[in-house]
Design a protein with these regions (language model features):
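C-terminal helical cap(s) of enzyme catalytic domains, especially alpha/beta-barrels
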Residues: 145-146, 151-154, 249-254, 258, ...
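Catalytic cores of alpha/beta
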Residues: 103-106, 111-112, 117-129, 223-257
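Conserved, mostly hydrophobic/aromatic
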Residues: 41, 125, 165, 206, ...
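Glycine-rich, proline-tolerant flexible connector loops at the mouths of alpha/beta enzymes
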Residues: 84-99, 137-143, 209-217
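Conserved beta-strand positions in the central sheet of alpha/beta enzyme cores
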Residues: 88-89, 134-135, 164, 207, ...
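Conserved anion-binding
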Residues: 47, 53-58, 130-213
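Charged helix-capping and loop-helix junction motifs
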Residues: 147-151, 188-193, 218-227, 276-278
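N-terminal active-site wall of soluble small-molecule enzyme domains
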Residues: 57, 68, 72-128
Length: 297
């Protein structure tokens, strides 16, 4: 097993994930099957579903699809009872720390946390019960230039095995470009196989929101899912646009089962009518023909 060469191989010294490569470059062994990953999106301390592209710093928006009257702990407890591992809590702006801690305390080790994560606070969120921390904007400067030193600090602080890199993106002339700052600012980084190869040794997973379709319930970005599935070397979760069970099946088909999916606004527990939570719980409990686990360890 080996890590990527060059300057990236120096990051974290001893904390880097080595990726075992199969005949087609995949580290996931056995039959791959797309899983449902739950989410708790927090805005102003409440569980909400919003249109991703409507997040702004200018006081306008966001466009809210749903505002829950239930506490974050209610959702976390349901995810725990149904063994829906690998979900994420996302803090959308300030005023969400207490709500995030409430969710994490309800299921210690069962949820990831993202939103305002940096090397300075990552450890405290792991101590609060997060299984992993999710980071995007902290890896770029104000102009969208990638900060190698920041990734080095994070890997040294918590280890690559506790880090999820969020490469949420927008469609551009070059394909898909990573967007930061609540998806308002495009960075210098495109989502390509080369980018994934470059970053994979330094994280446990990738989380990728298709920001242009997030919250619209008009279908997934199948081209992006296909690109991610064709790579498939470490776990990847896609979010954006899933409106029906057919969209979940499209993620399974387009990625050959190598990409997991998050569903938000279309889900009945978030006020939607396109997807039923219980159906997705049952989906995760299905087994491949040989009876092996969905994503074997």
């Amino acid at each position: 097993m080996e890590t990527r060469p060059g300057r990236w191989s120096k990051i974290g010294q001893g904390r880097i994930r080595s990726i075992p490569l199969g005949s087609e470059g995949h580290s996931l062994q056995g039959p791959s099957m797309t899983r449902f990953r739950p989410c708790i999106d927090l805005h102003e301390g409440k569980v909400k579903q919003i249109v991703g592209g409507s997040l702004r710093d200018d006081g306008a928006g966001p466009t809210e699809n749903f505002v829950s009257d239930k506490a974050p702990s209610w959702f976390a407890q349901s995810f725990r009872e149904n063994d829906l591992k690998g979900g994420h809590v996302i803090k959308l702006g300030p005023g969400n720390d207490d709500s995030a801690r409430e969710a994490l305390a309800t299921w210690p080790g069962g949820l990831q946390i993202g939103g305002g994560i940096s090397a300075a606070n990552a450890t405290q969120w792991l101590d609060a019960g997060a299984s992993h921390v999710i980071v995007t904007s902290a890896l770029f400067d104000a102009e969208g230039k990638f900060l190698t030193g920041t990734l080095e600090q994070l890997v040294r602080a918590i280890g690559a095995e506790r880090l999820v890199i969020d490469l949420s993106c927008r469609r551009t002339a070059t394909g898909w470009t990573v967007a930061m700052n609540r998806w308002q600012t495009l960075t210098e980084m495109d989502v390509t196989h080369a980018t994934l190869d470059r970053l994979a040794p330094f994280c446990a997973e990738f989380l990728i929101h298709a920001a242009d379709v997030e919250g619209l319930c008009r279908g997934i970005d199948a081209d992006l899912v296909s690109l991610l599935g064709a790579w498939g070397k470490i776990p990847v979760t896609y979010a954006g646009g899933a409106a029906t069970m057919e969209d979940v099946l499209r993620v399974q088909d387009a990625s050959h089962g190598k990409v997991d999916v998050t569903v938000g606004s279309a889900l009945d527990i978030f006020g939607g009518n396109g997807l039923i939570y219980r159906d997705l719980v049952d989906w995760n409990r299905r087994e491949p023909a040989d009876g092996s686990a969905l994503h074997p360890e």
